[in-house]
């Protein structure tokens, strides 16, 4: 919801990270829904735990585990250090990495190194460029697209759909007309695959089908249950204006917790594979907090999971690699106890039941 204020994109990016680290911005009335599912125990796994590998394939490349370090930040001076450390971890574990929105890099070349740094620290793993729906709606030139791809030698482009965030953002862009047409134009122009993701409100099956028909190759449902970006932007708004009189008290509470749980989105979008539809990969994100969450997501049909908030907090506390190691151990334990020798078996056997 736009208003007459001035604030640079760089300042906004910095405040996003600060609020996510220090503020209470989690959904308060919605969970991911993953807790409603239970991985089914196999008393005869017939496996050697020590030989289990979490490796899998994503967009034609072998990766270390079905986990993406999801889009977080970039476009301000301190972001270079954060992105460099994220890239180092991605390289060590051979995990895909998504950068934050590259709008700032298109606006000001001085901020490009905060994104380019990732490829220097992660020369072999998959890295994905990122741009938002409001920028898409305005139309991106072929030069803009090429600049983003070349800047980080990207393996693909993430387009994030963030209508609720933009609604709450003080300087948000809420004209979402022609986004789908522009997505189709971009997929036709680019030689790399396009990922469409939400940012915490979820993607429904009908919207996923529209995106797939527009040429998108990967759907990241990014459902509710983790960070509420409405709350992040609300915190920015109240820091600046003191109170928020844009909505009624009751309406505000509902809107701050607006969204569809991650598990609900995942099950619905995965069901599209049962009907004629373009082939696609499926990512589960939104409140992923452990390797067990990853395992449940895979068992519900995801090809991989993705996490941003939990990994950002562990990076801030200096425990990112330790966190990733424990998550991989969680995942291998779940594979062992469900009798799944590979990630494909965990996905195809559906060893999961609803509580």
UniProtKB/Swiss-Prot annotation:
Domain of life: Bacteria
CDD domains (UniProt xref): IDI-2_FMN
Keywords: Cytoplasm, Flavoprotein, FMN, Isomerase, Isoprene biosynthesis, Magnesium, Metal-binding, NADP
Primary residence: cytoplasm
Listed cofactors: FMN; NADPH; Mg(2+)
A GO CC term assigned to this protein in UniProt: cytoplasm
EC number annotated for this UniProt entry: 5.3.3.2
Residues at which FMN binds: 70-73, 101, 130, 197, 308-309
Gene3D superfamilies named in the record: Aldolase class I
Binding-site residues for Mg(2+), renumbered to this chain: 166
Positions of transmembrane segments: none
Positions annotated to bind substrate: 12-13, 101-103, 165
Any one of the GO BP annotations: isoprenoid biosynthetic process
One Gene Ontology term of the molecular function aspect: NADPH binding
Catalytic activity entry: isopentenyl diphosphate = dimethylallyl diphosphate
InterPro entries: Aldolase_TIM, FMN-dep_DH, IPdP_isomerase
Subcellular localization, as worded in the UniProt entry: Cytoplasm
Pfam families in the cross-refs: FMN_dh
UniProt function note: Involved in the biosynthesis of isoprenoids. Catalyzes the 1,3-allylic rearrangement of the homoallylic substrate isopentenyl (IPP) to its allylic isomer, dimethylallyl diphosphate (DMAPP).
Quaternary organization: Homooctamer. Dimer of tetramers.
Entry similarity comment: Belongs to the IPP isomerase type 2 family.
Name the UniProt record assigns to this protein: Isopentenyl-diphosphate delta-isomerase
Species: Chlorobium phaeovibrioides (strain DSM 265 / 1930) (Prosthecochloris vibrioformis (strain DSM 265))
Protein's gene: fni
């Amino acid at each position: 919801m736009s208003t007459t204020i001035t604030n640079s994109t760089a300042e906004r990016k910095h405040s996003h990270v600060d609020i996510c680290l220090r503020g209470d911005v989690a959904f308060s009335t919605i969970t991911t829904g993953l807790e409603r599912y239970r991985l089914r125990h196999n008393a005869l796994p017939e496996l050697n735990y020590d030989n289990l590998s979490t490796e899998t394939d994503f967009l034609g490349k072998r990766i270390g585990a079905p986990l993406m370090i999801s889009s977080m930040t970039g476009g301000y001076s301190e972001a270079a250090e954060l992105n460099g450390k994220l890239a180092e971890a991605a390289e060590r574990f051979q995990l895909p990495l998504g950068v934050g929105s590259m709008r700032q890099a298109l606006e000001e070349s001085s901020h490009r190194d905060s994104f380019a740094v990732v490829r220097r620290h992660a020369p072999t793993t998959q890295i994905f460029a990122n741009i938002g729906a409001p920028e898409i709606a305005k139309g991106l030139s072929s030069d803009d697209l090429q600049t983003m791809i070349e800047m980080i030698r990207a393996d693909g482009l993430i387009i994030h759909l963030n209508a609720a965030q933009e609604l709450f953002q003080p300087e948000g862009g809420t004209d979402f007309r022609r986004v789908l047409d522009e997505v189709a134009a971009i997929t036709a122009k680019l030689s790399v695959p396009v990922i469409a993701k939400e940012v915490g409100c979820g993607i429904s099956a009908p919207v996923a089908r529209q995106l797939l028909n527009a040429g998108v190759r990967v759907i990241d449902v990014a459902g509710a249950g983790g960070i509420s970006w409405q709350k992040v932007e609300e915190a920015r708004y109240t820091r600046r204006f003191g109170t928020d009189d844009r909505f009624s008290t009751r309406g505000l509470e509902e809107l701050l917790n607006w969204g569809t749980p991650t598990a609900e989105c995942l099950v619905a979008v995965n069901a599209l594979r049962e009907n004629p539809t373009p082939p696609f990969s499926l990512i589960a994100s939104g409140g992923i907090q452990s390797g067990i969450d990853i395992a449940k997501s895979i068992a519900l049909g995801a090809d991989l999971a993705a996490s941003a908030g939990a990994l950002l907090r562990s990076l801030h506390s200096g425990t990112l690699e330790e966190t990733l190691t424990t998550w991989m151990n969680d995942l291998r334990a779940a594979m062992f106890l469900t009798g799944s020798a590979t990630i494909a078996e965990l996905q195809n056997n559906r060893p999961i039941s609803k509580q």
